[in-house]
Amino acid sequence: MAYINATLRSTLMGRSVAVSLYFPNDYPETVVPEIRGVVTLLHGYTNSGQDWLQMSSACRYAADNGLILVAPSCENSFYCDMVYGDAWYTFVTEELPVLLNRFFKLPTEREKNFIAGLSMGGYGAMMVGLNHPERYAGVASFSGAVDLALMFEKGRDLPQLRQQFVPVFGQDLTLPDQYDLHKLAVKASGLPAEKQPKLLFTCGMQDDAVYEIRTQNTALYNTMQPLPFANYRYLTWPGNHEWKFWDRSLVYAIDYFLENGYAEQKLGDWRSEVQTAP
């Protein structure tokens, strides 16, 4: 295996950006004979891409399935081109793929590229994936802040929350159509089935304090239900805004992307009977 903490120079933003990568060159050939694809993992607010490799079992899950992981650090940008800050959306969607291909020759085929994220990164994964369905075969959001309009409304009464959004969206907290997941879902659902990405979002049943994350995810699901999506899924189980939940969510996402029964295998491992030595 190989872990790489790269620092890539962004000409677009005139600065360096940290990107963590994992390459699974030691997976069992009898199970996975080749690299199956690349999963881009987006981090949450106040976090970094490296958290995915340090706080979860993402690397082990990637090794089991022959997947390369790419985890860029995009600050508190919500993966948007900020009103008062850097152009992170353009970096993630335009410049980063070029840099990764130049330095690491990663697979570029749509069927081998997936994107997932947690919390702020869950929103980012959905937003990027729905804006670019031609690039990703699968998109997953874990405990995603998927309804920013609702959060803007809450921010009017919570100055601390409002201040999280002002650098990204401006003083009037305007949400452009290209960043509105409800509108993006309607647009993407009009594509032919074979051009739609698989969509998965998960949320813990107890994840509704302060930011009403579960309420946000349920609202997005309700928007999507009547739309002609070919392949989407909303999973929820007991849990909160925490790594334990996101780790399990990644297992379900890999299984959903690859359709290889991986989730059932891991659940079987977790349920294995524990015996106490005499």
Name every feature range the model reports, one short phrase each:
Residues 1-278:
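Non-catalytic cap/lid and distal C-terminal segments of serine-dependent acyl enzymes
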